[in-house]
Amino acid sequence: MRTNLRRNAIRLVAAASAFGLPLALVPPAQADPGVSAVQSQLVNSVTAPLVKNHLRALQNIANANNGTRAAGTKGHDASAEYVAAKLRKAGWRVTLQPFEFGYFTENSAATLAQISPDPKTYTPTEPGSSTLGDFSTMTYSASGDVTGTVQAVDLTLPPTPAPSSTSGCEASDFAGFTRGNVALVQRGTCDFEVKARNALAAGASAVIIFNEGQPGRTNTVLGRLAGPGVTIPVLGASFAVGEDLASPAGTVVHIKTDTTSENRLTHNVIADSRWGDPNKVVMIGAHLDSVVDGPGINDNGSGSAADLTVAEALGRIPTTNRLRFAWWSAEELGLLGSQYYVDNLPADQRSKVKLYLNFDMVASPNYALKIYDGDDSDQTGSPAGPAGSAEIEKLFEKYFDTLRQPHNGTDFDGRSDYGPFIEVGIPSGGLFTGAEGIKTAEEAALFGGVAGQPYDGCYHQACDTVANISDKALALNTGAIATAAVVYGFSRNLPGSGAPAAAAPQKKTLASVAADGRVSG
């Protein structure tokens, strides 16, 4: 039986053709002697056309569901069912892990207008637009249609040189607040949720949170609350709008928001192989959800489809270690699916997860080949990952070096699903080809493409379709995923085995996002 299954392994990873997937022959540490022979013959089962077929299927699902595959929508449910069905057919044990989360969408653009003393209409940040208006609707704001008098709450005008405003951070800031008024609150030293909750408790009919005013803190606030539950409209605004509304006293405004903010059920898709040591789990993941505003084919259909293609090829191959693939939900709302998984994994099971590999946005059209900086050799941002992360980084470096492909590092900045694993000391790594960041001239010289332009100009937009994919980046990175899966699936000494965990970099969850409005890839 094992011999027959080993023959099936010959069909795993592609030859290097125009859209085939190169497999760099990186031998597993102390692997089964037969593995190198298996690796050298792994052809036909993992090809870029197969990955593209999955991407087209995800696009079709989005097309049939209002252009989105966001967590909590029928588009995501159908995506999860599609992945699960493919995995079961390939021989995996599949679990749909349910969890509840806060769903939010802005159904139409909001209104903010000054009625008196000087009539004026402010420009909204349109739903799904990357162009900032004068104000925005905060994620998890309630719907509402309010006309009321603006009442300033403990503002610091002019602002201090360094951020210091505590406006709205204490219930006592609202002493003397007139019920039904619109609370005008300044960004500062506490979470937006705290400000909004205090305003709600004081009887405010709506809240406007404007930027604090220091250099770098003047643009429109793009913020989020911790979840559904604040039952009044909550807007973020620029410092200029805040100054405008703060004086004179008695200014009257009209606010209208049209949102859906509620708790919904979604699922992670978890697939375990039937082979390998259950005490040595090699975990590979990608988030499956898109943003509400688009189909999410690069972000992150690319990582999801690449992982799925590799998993299909590996399903009936008896590996030395247990392989576990995961497709996370609600990553776009703050890594919620992966965080739920890690938080609810019993300690004895968590200790069996020996490493985690994350693949988020692996086919950006203006790509750079980025490897997560496990050893902090780039000396930027967050510190090194847990012990073993450096070895993972070196494996991917060797893969690209073998193919004579340039590569560079990318920081563990907490924007994707490795965050919860790093936080608990699990060695982590992965690949990334860039999001809304701007490609440098040095990167353009290495990878081609256009310097001065985003890696993905359709990031978090409706144009993130199957046309928004680099076939070359998709092929190279899928080959890297397949290589890592085989290497770690058969390795007898996994990265970081027996070593103490390094200090974990700070992950970006809703608590930290509240201060700057940033979430994830």
What would you call each of these model-derived segments?
Residues 279, 292, 318, 328-435, ...:
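Metal-dependent peptidase/peptidase-like ectodomains
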Residues 1-31:
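Secretory targeting and sorting signals
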Residues 37-46, 64-75, 184-190, 195-196, ...:
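Second-shell loop/turn segments in exported
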Residues 48-67, 73, 84-90, 162-163, ...:
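Catalytic-core environment of secreted peptidases
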Residues 502-521:
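Acidic, Ser/Thr-rich low-complexity intrinsically disordered segments
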Residues 137-168, 224-297, 309-312, 316, ...:
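Soluble metallo-hydrolase cores and metallopeptidase-like ectodomains found primarily
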Residues 31, 37, 44, 56, ...:
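Noncatalytic luminal/extracellular "stalk/propeptide" segments of secretory-pathway proteins
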Residues 438-506:
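His/Asp/Glu-rich mid-to-C-terminal helical/loop segments that flank catalytic regions of hydrolases
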